[in-house]
From Swiss-Prot:
Similarity comment: Belongs to the transcription factor STAT family.
Tissues in which the protein is found: In the virgin, found in most tissues. Particularly abundant in muscle tissue of virgin and lactating females, and of males.
Record localization: Cytoplasm; Nucleus
Underlying gene: Stat5b
This protein's name: Signal transducer and activator of transcription 5B
Length: 786
C-alpha cells in the first residue's frame, strides 16, 4: 500500500504530527496530488554533503515543478479551475523557494517521508502482537507528552497569576498615590478658615484611615500573591528538571548509545526529530517561565515590600538559568560522527546540530563552530575544566563552519564537508600499547547567544574516540580498538576508559553485530560458529557454548597476543574472514553454501559418512582471510582432501563459483545439495567458441582454469566411464570458459593511475618470496591455474 494512503489513515496525535510536517515550505496539497511521483523518486540516493550532487537535486526540483504544472493543466470543470490555479501557484512558489538551494528541497522531502514512515510504523506496531516494544516506547512517549501538557497548563496558570498580581499591584499603586494626595491636602488645610478646615480635616482623616487600612491589607495580599507565585514557579521548575532529565539524561543518552553501537554495525540510531521537538518544547516552556520570573522581579523592584519573596525569586531565577544552560549545552550534539578510524591526509566529514536553535533564536546570529583534535588526556582535562586552551594534538584543515538554519526542517546545524587531518602529535605510549590503541577525539566548540545576547553560552562536544592511522595496513588493528571501545564503553565514563576484560557472551554480541554489518547479511553467527570461535580463542575443546559463558576475554587476548602457534591475533583472523566474505563470498554465505567456522578434524567428521565428491568450504586456520575446500574421495592414498586456501587475491583473478565449476569431481555441497544447483547461477557465462577460434587480431585466446594436479587427468578424461569425476558444470554454462590472460587487478599497488605505495609493494614481494621458498605442507593439495 502506498505510504500516502496509509498516512491518511492516521488518527489522533499521529495525524496532527503528520499534518505539522507540511506548510508553506511544502504544501500538503502537493504531497496529495503528486504522492505516487514523490514516493517513486530516489531521494535517499542523494548525498546532501556532496556539492556535486546538486545537479541531481536540481533535476528533482525541475521534475516536481513539471509534474505540478502537468497536474494543473489536466484540471477541468468549476472545481478544477480553482485547483488549477492553486497547483500552478504552488509550482511557481516551490520553484522560487528552492531554485537557488535544491538540496533543501531534498532535505525537506526526506524529512517528511521519514516521519510519515515512522508514524505509520508506530501506528501499525501498536495494533500488532509483535509491537510490545513499540507499545512500551509509545507509553513512554505518551508520558512525556502528558508531562508537557501539564507543564503547559501550569505555565498558563502562572501567567494568569502574574497578570492578576500585576493588575492588583497597579491598582495598589493608584490607591497609594491617592494616599499621598490626601497627605498633600492635609498640608493645604492651613489656608482654610477654622470651620471649613475642621470639617475638611475630619473627612480627610476618615478617608486616610480607611485608605491606609486598605493599603495595609492589600500589601499583605500582594505579598501573599508574590509568595504563592514564587512557590508555583518552584514547583514548575522541579517538574521541568524532572522532564529535562528524562529527555537529556535518558532519551538523548540512549540515542548517543545507539549512535555508538551503529559504529560497530548496529541498527541506525534513528532520527533526531522527535528529540528535537521535545527539546524545543522544553526550551519554549523554560523561556516562558524565565520571562515570568523576570517580570515578577520587576514588579518587586517597582514596589518593594519587605519579606522572603526577593530571596525566593533570586533562587528560582538562578535555578532556571542553570536549567536553560544545561539544555543548550547538552543539545549541542554530533549528528554525523567523523570516521573513527581516521587516516591522515584524507578527506572526512562530520555534522553538528543544536536541537534548540530555532526556538531560542540562536540562528538570528549564526554561530561559528570550530573542530580540533585532542588526545585522551586532553579530553580528561577538558572535562575537569582545566585550562586547555590552544592545547591540541594535531592540525585539521577546513575546521571552521558557520551553523545554518534550514527553514523546511527547522534544524540548526553545521556541515563540515571537507576536513582533513594534516598532521598528528602522538603522546608517549604505555607499556605494550601500540599506535593503533591510542585514542583521540574531535572537539567541536562554539559560542551561542540566547534571547538577543541576554545569555551567552560556551558550548563544547566531543566525538566518539578516533584512532589515527597513517597507512592502510594499520586499519585492521585500529578497527579492533574502535570495536572494543564502542561495544564496552560505560555511560558517564572518564575519557576513554573501557574495561580490560569482558565476558565472552558480551564479546559474542559485539562480534555478531560487526559481522552482519560488514558482510551485509542477515545470516549472523550461529551457536556452532560461536563455539568454534571460543575454542579458537581459549584453546579449549568443549563443544558446549554454555561452558564459555562465565569466561572472560581480555583486550590482550583479543588483539595484542598472537593465538597459540600462530603469528596473528584472534581479531586479525576474524577480520580476515569478514574481509574475504565481504569482497568476494557474500552471496555464497547468504545462500548457506559456506560452512566456514569448522576446523579440519570437524570437517572430516562431517564428511566421513557422505558419498565421494561431497565437499564443504571452511575458513583457513593458517592463512588470514583464506578459505579452503575440504572434500571426500576415498582413494588408496587418502580419504579426505584439503585444497590450499584461496585468498582475496585469488578471487580477484577467478571467482569461487568458477573455480568450483572447474573441479568436476566436486559433486555435492555439504550436506547433500548438488553443486550446480547451488553455484551455477554464479558461473561466469561465456559464449561457447571452438577451441581454435581466433580473435580479430589473429591471437588465440588463452584460458584460465582451476586445476588440482592429482585430479587433473581424471577431471579432463572425457572418454572414461561414468564416475563422480565426470560431473561437469550446469549445461547452460559453457564448460570451456575463456578469459583474458591478465585480468584487471584491483590491487592499488598495481594501479598505474594510483599512488605508488612502497610498503604495499614490499608486502606483495615478501608474500611471493614466502610462497616460493615455503616447503609444501602435506596437509594441503596445491591448486594451479592452467
Amino acid at each position: 500500500m502506498a505510504m500516502w494512503i496509509q498516512a491518511q489513515q492516521l488518527q489522533g496525535d499521529a495525524l496532527h504530527q503528520m499534518q505539522a510536517l507540511y506548510g508553506q515550505h511544502f504544501p500538503i496539497e502537493v504531497r496529495h496530488y503528486l504522492s505516487q511521483w514523490i514516493e517513486s523518486q530516489a531521494w535517499d540516493s542523494i548525498d546532501l554533503d556532496n556539492p556535486q550532487e546538486n545537479i541531481k537535486a536540481t533535476q528533482l526540483l525541475e521534475g516536481l515543478v513539471q509534474e505540478l504544472q502537468k497536474k494543473a493543466e489536466h484540471q477541468v470543470g468549476e472545481d478544477g479551475f480553482l485547483l488549477k490555479i492553486k497547483l500552478g501557484h504552488y509550482a511557481t512558489q516551490l520553484q522560487s523557494t528552492y531554485d537557488r538551494c535544491p538540496m533543501e528541497l531534498v532535505r525537506c522531502i526526506r524529512h517528511i517521508l521519514y516521519n510519515e514512515q515512522r508514524l505509520v510504523r508506530e501506528a501499525n506496531n501498536g495494533s500488532s502482537p509483535a509491537g510490545s516494544l513499540a507499545d512500551a516506547m509509545s507509553q513512554k512517549h505518551l508520558q512525556i507528552n502528558q508531562t508537557f501538557e501539564e507543564l503547559r497548563l501550569i505555565t498558563q496558570d502562572t501567567e494568569n497569576e502574574l497578570k492578576k498580581l500585576q493588575q492588583t499591584q497597579e491598582y495598589f499603586i493608584i490607591q497609594y498615590q491617592e494616599s499621598l494626595r490626601i497627605q498633600a491636602q492635609f498640608a493645604q488645610l492651613g489656608q482654610l478658615n477654622p470651620q471649613e478646615r475642621m470639617s475638611r480635616e475630619t473627612a480627610l482623616q476618615q478617608k486616610q484611615v480607611s485608605l491606609e487600612t486598605w493599603l495595609q491589607r492589600e500589601a499583605q495580599t500582594l505579598q501573599q500573591y508574590r509568595v504563592e507565585l514564587a512557590e508555583k514557579h518552584q514547583k514548575t521548575l522541579q517538574l521541568l528538571r524532572k522532564q529535562q532529565t528524562i529527555i537529556l539524561d535518558d532519551e538523548l543518552i540512549q540515542w548517543k548509545r545507539r549512535q555508538q553501537l551503529a559504529g560497530n554495525g548496529g541498527p541506525p540510531e534513528g532520527s533526531l526529530d522527535v528529540l528535537q521537538s521535545w527539546c524545543e518544547k522544553l526550551a519554549e516552556i523554560i523561556w516562558q517561565n524565565r520571562q515570568q520570573i523576570r517580570r515578577a522581579e520587576h514588579l518587586c523592584q517597582q514596589l518593594p515590600i519587605p519579606g522572603p519573596v526577593e530571596e525566593m525569586l533570586a533562587e528560582v531565577n538562578a535555578t532556571i538559568t542553570d536549567i536553560i544552560s544545561a539544555l543548550v549545552t547538552s543539545t549541542f550534539i554530533i549528528e554525523k560522527q567523523p570516521p573513527q578510524v581516521l587516516k591522515t591526509q584524507t578527506k572526512f566529514a562530520a555534522t553538528v546540530r543544536l536541537l534548540v536553535g530555532g526556538k531560542l533564536n540562536v540562528h538570528m546570529n549564526p554561530p561559528q563552530v570550530k573542530a580540533t583534535i585532542i588526545s585522551e588526556q586532553q579530553a580528561k582535562s577538558l572535562l575537569k575544566n582545566e585550562n586547555t586552551r590552544n592545547d591540541y594534538s594535531g592540525e585539521i584543515l577546513n575546521n571552521c563552519c558557520v551553523m545554518e538554519y534550514h527553514q523546511a526542517t527547522g534544524t540548526l546545524s553545521a556541515h563540515f564537508r571537507n576536513m582533513s587531518l594534516k598532521r598528528i602529535k602522538r603522546s608517549d605510549r604505555r607499556g605494550a600499547e601500540s599506535v593503533t590503541e591510542e585514542k583521540f577525539t574531535i572537539l567541536f566548540d562554539s559560542q551561542f547567544s540566547v534571547g538577543g545576547n541576554e545569555l551567552v553560552f560556551q558550548v563544547k562536544t566531543l566525538s566518539l574516540p578516533v584512532v589515527v592511522i597513517v597507512h592502510g595496513s594499520q586499519d585492521n588493528n585500529a578497527t579492533a580498538t574502535v570495536l572494543w571501545d564502542n561495544a564496552f564503553a560505560e555511560p558517564g565514563r572518564v575519557p576513554f576508559a573501557v574495561p580490560d576484560k569482558v565476558l565472552w557472551p558480551q564479546l559474542c554480541e559485539a562480534l555478531n553485530m560487526k559481522f552482519k554489518a560488514e558482510v551485509q547479511s542477515n545470516r549472523g553467527l550461529t551457536k556452532e560458529n560461536l563455539v568454534f570461535l571460543a575454542q579458537k580463542l581459549f584453546n579449549i575443546s568443549s563443544n558446549h557454548l554454555e561452558d564459555y559463558n562465565s569466561m572472560s576475554v581480555s583486550w590482550s587476548q583479543f588483539n595484542r597476543e598472537n593465538l597459540p602457534g600462530r603469528n596473528y591475533t584472534f581479531w586479525q583472523w576474524f577480520d580476515g574472514v569478514m574481509e574475504v566474505l565481504k569482497k568476494h563470498l557474500k552471496p555464497h554465505w547468504n545462500d548457506g553454501a559456506i560452512l566456514g567456522f569448522v576446523n579440519k578434524q570437524q570437517a572430516h567428521d562431517l564428511l566421513i559418512n557422505k558419498p565421494d565428491g561431497t565437499f564443504l568450504l571452511r575458513f583457513s586456520d593458517s592463512e588470514i582471510g583464506g578459505i579452503t575446500i575440504a572434500w571426500k574421495f576415498d582413494s588408496q592414498e587418502r580419504m579426505f582432501w584439503n585444497l590450499m586456501p584461496f585468498t582475496t587475491r585469488d578471487f580477484s583473478i577467478r571467482s569461487l563459483a568458477d573455480r568450483l565449476g572447474d573441479l568436476n569431481y566436486l559433486i555435492y555441497v555439504f550436506p547433500d545439495r548438488p553443486k550446480d544447483e547451488v553455484y551455477s547461477k554464479y558461473y561466469t557465462p561465456v559464449p561457447c567458441e571452438p577451441a581454435t577460434a581466433k580473435a580479430a587480431d589473429g591471437y588465440v585466446k588463452p584460458q584460465i582454469k582451476q586445476v588440482v594436479p592429482e585430479f587433473a587427468n581424471a577431471s579432463t578424461d572425457a572418454g572414461s566411464g561414468a564416475t563422480y569425476m565426470d560431473q561437469a558444470p550446469s549445461p547452460v554454462v559453457c564448460p570451456q570458459a575463456h578469459y583474458n590472460m591478465y585480468p584487471p587487478n584491483p590491487d592499488s599497488v598495481l594501479d598505474t593511475d594510483g599512488d605508488f605505495d612502497l610498503e604495499d609493494t614490499m608486502d606483495v614481494a615478501r608474500r611471493v618470496e614466502e610462497l616460493l621458498g615455503r616447503p609444501m605442507d602435506s596437509q594441503w593439495i596445491p591448486h594451479a591455474q592452467s
